[in-house]
Amino acid sequence: MARVTVEDAVEQIGNRFDMILVAARRARQIAVQGKDPMVEEMNDKPTVIALREIELGLVNAHTLDADERQSVREREAAEIAAVAAIAEGRSL
């Protein structure tokens, strides 16, 4: 079992409340959305992985926001391409 102290993660984020929000968002990305961990998993749960990523400075609120914006852009581009393909199929 990995021993994670949150003091290092709190120092990276600034305060414990924001750290909790960032850790929860990142853990959800790993567990539910299938995002790849940026550190070795070592059979840890997503929450522990998220805390380790925060401790190492790999994840913060800004990186999560940027990743989310990129995901939205990619999803919108895929939707536009699908609509364009449907429209081309109907116009023939």
Curated annotation (Swiss-Prot):
A Gene Ontology cellular-component term: DNA-directed RNA polymerase complex
GO terms, molecular function: DNA binding; DNA-directed RNA polymerase activity
Enzyme class: transferase
Catalyzed reaction equations: RNA(n) + a ribonucleoside 5'-triphosphate = RNA(n+1) + diphosphate
Keyword field contains Repeat: no
Gene3D superfamilies: 3.90.940.10
A single GO BP: DNA-templated transcription
UniProtKB keywords: DNA-directed RNA polymerase, Nucleotidyltransferase, Transcription, Transferase
EC number: 2.7.7.6
Any matching Pfam family: RNA_pol_Rpb6
Any coiled-coil regions, as ranges: none
Repressor recorded as keyword: no
Recorded family membership: Belongs to the RNA polymerase subunit omega family.
Summary of the function given for this chain in its UniProt record: Promotes RNA polymerase assembly. Latches the N- and C-terminal regions of the beta' subunit thereby facilitating its interaction with the beta and alpha subunits.
Assembly and interaction partners: The RNAP catalytic core consists of 2 alpha, 1 beta, 1 beta' and 1 omega subunit. When a sigma factor is associated with the core the holoenzyme is formed, which can initiate transcription.
Protein name (record): DNA-directed RNA polymerase subunit omega
Gene name as annotated: rpoZ
